[in-house]
């Protein structure tokens, strides 16, 4: 188990996903369905409940750490507003040879960031940039992972360009990788950032936030 975790910045709070978030997530996902061409985003209470329950099953097994993405001050009268989801997934603890210098206990060696979606109004805001900064900072500086990976539909040229802009490197194309959000068999573009690259990536993300740059960075 690697959670539950709460990660908080100036614009966003990532809090442990639970079934109480379902009504707010349904509302967030209903605002503009055209935003979800490349990432599966449940529609309606039944689908959203099943989605969250599946996430919680993966959390309980230690495979995922799932968050509700909360935009601070994004709701009526400056209240906080649930605007989407994201996760640590593909969490692996490597089996090192006995006595290996890199052997650690209780933390992962590599992780993915995925299952990311946001409401339409939360896109092109600092929310996703800060969420990625919070998650990568935790992964590299608290867990001290060797690699963070991100992937997106190979056709999602906008997200691919955004990942490359912050320093993600294309590791390869995974053919027939998973179900696509558009009822196709998805081919994925897989990117990674390794620990030696993290300082430059962190600086780029921090600069994007400071400059108010809000180009999309939402792999899944």
Give a label for each model feature.
Residues 1-125, 138, 142, 178, ...:
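GNAT-family acyltransferases
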Residues 112, 130, 147-149, 158, ...:
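Amphipathic alpha-helical recognition patches that constitute DNA-binding helices
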Residues 118, 150-160:
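Conserved beta-strand-loop-alpha-helix junction that forms the acyl-donor binding cleft
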Residues 124-138, 161:
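Conserved acetyl-CoA-binding loop-helix of GNAT-fold acetyltransferases
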Residues 141-151:
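Conserved GNAT acetyl-CoA-binding A-motif
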Residues 151, 169-183:
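Conserved catalytic-core motifs of GNAT/GCN5-like acyltransferases
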Residues 156-172:
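Conserved active-site alpha-helix within GNAT-family acetyltransferase domains
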